[in-house]
Amino acid sequence: MFYKIKNIYFKIIIFLIFVFKLTFSSSYAKDNSLLLMITEKTCLICMVWEKQIGEIYPKTEIANKFPLSRIEMKDFVNYSKHELKKTNVTPTFIFIRNNNEQGRIEGYTSPEMFWWQVDEI
């Protein structure tokens, strides 16, 4: 009987380690990857993107790899988390992984074009 109790505790510990590792791994990936959207409150194209893509983006597979983070253009000028080249276009989407720019999309024309550009990155 003591052996069975010991075996159950062992299985529970292994299970908890597995769950912890799985949780830690996925949050680690999210912390090191993001999609930075540079926007402005008065940007009409940004508003169109929000309506057409912004509402569904969090539900997509790419959002698991690159969670969306928005920043105003005026704040991007002083943004120093990552060394990124400047932009004068809103919206601009910068894909960042491990503090390095993986790709960027400047502007927005349509959902089809946006997803095509995302696939290219």
Language model features with spans:
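N-terminal secretory signal peptides that target proteins for export/translocation
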Residues: 1-8
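Bacterial N-terminal signal peptides
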Residues: 11-23
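Short pre-active-site segment immediately N-terminal to redox-active cysteine/selenocysteine motifs
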Residues: 39-45, 89
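Typically the conserved alpha-helix immediately C-terminal to a functionally engaged Cys/Sec
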Residues: 47-62
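A short, hydrophobic beta-strand/beta-hairpin element that forms part of a small beta-sheet core
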Residues: 90-103
